[in-house]
Structure formats: C-alpha cells, structure tokens
Amino acid sequence: MEGSGEHGETSKGPLSKGVSRGLCILDLIFRVIAVIGTLASAIAMGTTNQTMPFFTQFVQFKERYSDLPTLTFFVVANSIASAYLIISLPLSIVHIIRSRAKYSRLILIFFDVAMLALVTAAASAGAAIVYLAHNGNVSANWFAICQQFDSFCERISGSLIGSFAAMVVLILLILLSAVALARR
C-alpha cells in the first residue's frame, strides 16, 4: 500500500510530466493570445482619427486619440504589455522544454501581475473616456461626440475589447503559473 499514492501524495511519474508539459504549452498559447489582444488594442487605438468638415472644407474638426491623454496612456500601456509578452515568449518555450524551472516561473508571475495591473488601469481609463464619448456628462456640460465622430468612437470602443480580453488572459496566465508552481 505504500506506493499506491493515497493520502494526498502526488505521483512524479510520466503522467505528472505530461500534465506539467500541457500546462507549459497552455501558458505559451495564452501568452500568444495576450500578445494579439494587447497589440491589436494598441494599434487600433493608435491609428484612430477622424476629420469632419464644418460648414466648408476649409474649416474642419479633427479628432485623434492623442487629443486625450487617457487614450495615449491606453496606447502606451498596451504597447508595454505587448512588448513584455513578446519578450516572455522564449522563456515560456524554455518552460516547455524544461518544465521544472522554478525561479524563471516566479519571475514571470511577478511581471505578469505587474502587466495585469497596467492593462487593467489602461482598459479602465479607456472605458471611462469611451463612456463619456458615447454619453457625455450633462452636469459638466460635456457633450457626447460619438454622434458626430461615429467612426472614431467605433474604433476606440473596439480597441477596448482586445484590452479587456488580454486582462482575462493575463489572469488565467497567473492562475496557470500558480498551479504549475504548486505542482512542484
């Protein structure tokens, strides 16, 4: 009965290695998905602008993401998170090859949490501005601009989707890394 694996003991056999390798592959897949989400959000927001003529072609109103510092923060934060995630991809591949690496996984968890905080702050700030763009604020006499700049608003609203998706994937990455460390 000693080798039966009862009473909370875990097996270090081939099945355990297969599960660890599976967790590492899932980590790599999640990182690629998070790169796509953050990079797409940064590009979509960073290339957003719309020009609207006012009475004549000589007088025009132009709306750009860079007109609002919050949206600039959104682009920078998602770019930083995307760069980090791209840099972390080789380390994630190393974990597939050497699934016993403990310290590098701890470093990844630390930076994953920092990137989660950064992306959460950026997505939340961006969502507040998008809400104001769609609805305005009557008490502050801020008018909704989305009725005039519809293309601009569609793009900034769409860029939030990738950022919030990346947030969810980063949470899953942190949980996955915690499970992988707990299995050691």
Swiss-Prot record:
Residues 44-72, 127-159 are extracellular. InterPro entries: CASP/CASPL, CASP_dom, CASPL. Its main location: membrane. The keyword Transmembrane applies. Glycans are attached at residues 49, 137. GO terms for biological process: cell wall organization. Pfam families: CASP_dom. Residues 1-22, 94-105, 181-184 are cytoplasmic. Keywords: Cell membrane, Cell wall biogenesis/degradation, Glycoprotein, Membrane, Transmembrane, Transmembrane helix. It is found in: Cell membrane. It is a multi-pass membrane protein. One of its GO terms (cellular component) is plasma membrane. PANTHER family: CASP-LIKE PROTEIN (PTHR36488:SF12), CASP-LIKE PROTEIN 1U1 (PTHR36488). Belongs to the Casparian strip membrane proteins (CASP) family. Homodimer and heterodimers. Regulates membrane-cell wall junctions and localized cell wall deposition. Required for establishment of the Casparian strip membrane domain (CSD) and the subsequent formation of Casparian strips, a cell wall modification of the root endodermis that determines an apoplastic barrier between the intraorganismal apoplasm and the extraorganismal apoplasm and prevents lateral diffusion. This is Casparian strip membrane protein 3. The lineage of its organism: Eukaryota, Viridiplantae, Streptophyta, Embryophyta, Tracheophyta.
